[in-house]
């Protein structure tokens, strides 16, 4: 068990000038001190990069270059990450509060745990998804939680995402 591990938060973006800043602020204003913030931008042309540059001193690594879609960008983030845990916080997504990471990672986490997840606020009115417990076999057919609310141990990303699988997000 390890206290206060390094958390890599990866934001992928493409032409997200209207939403990237709120995401950056949500990450860099976390009270948890052990955060490596990574932004992988797909070569935006709308001013997104200017906003990223504005906060460059608070971002461990960022790049803006063409990619093959969201999962290629996420794989770039995985390869760059040095943290023990990874979270994918896309442009436009926010942590629920400034102390979200502190609440999750300030206590010891059993070495056998490889994924941590929580509820997600679905809209600004505060409507929350209802947490449900699914058998592990459910993950073979569907993701029972949003990646924005999950933290996965780096060991779960040995091979990254398979770019050959069809995705509705591409």
What are these regions (language model features)?
Residues 1-29:
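N-proximal low-complexity "stem/linker" segments adjacent to membrane-targeting elements
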Residues 18-21, 46-54:
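Acidic helix N-cap motif at the loop->helix transition within catalytic regions
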Residues 27, 42-43, 68-69:
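Conserved short acidic donor-positioning loop in nucleotide-sugar-dependent glycosyltransferases
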Residues 33, 41-50, 90:
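A conserved acidic beta->alpha catalytic loop
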Residues 64-81:
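Glycine-rich, basic loop-to-helix element that forms the pyrophosphate-binding segment
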Residues 86:
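Short aromatic/hydrophobic "clamp" motif used to bind/position activated sugar donors
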Residues 94, 98-130:
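Conserved donor NDP-sugar-binding/catalytic core segment of glycosyltransferases
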Residues 118, 129-170:
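Conserved nucleotide-sugar donor-binding catalytic segment
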């Amino acid at each position: 068990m390890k206290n206060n591990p390094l958390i890599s938060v990866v934001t992928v973006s493409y032409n997200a000038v209207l939403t990237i800043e709120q995401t950056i602020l949500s990450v860099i204003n976390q009270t948890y001190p052990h955060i490596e913030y990574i932004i992988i931008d797909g070569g935006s042309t709308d001013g997104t990069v200017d906003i990223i540059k504005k906060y460059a001193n608070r971002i461990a690594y960022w790049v803006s270059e063409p990619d093959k879609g969201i999962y290629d960008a996420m794989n770039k983030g995985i390869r760059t990450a040095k943290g023990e845990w990874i979270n994918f916080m896309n442009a436009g997504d926010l942590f629920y509060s400034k102390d979200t990471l502190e609440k999750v990672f300030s206590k010891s986490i059993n070495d056998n745990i490889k994924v941590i997840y929580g509820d997600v606020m679905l809209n600004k009115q505060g409507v929350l998804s209802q947490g449900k417990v699914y058998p592990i076999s459910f993950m073979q057919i569907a993701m029972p939680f949003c990646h924005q609310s999950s933290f996965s141990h780096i060991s779960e990303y040995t091979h990254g995402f398979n770019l050959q699988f069809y995705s509705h997000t591409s």
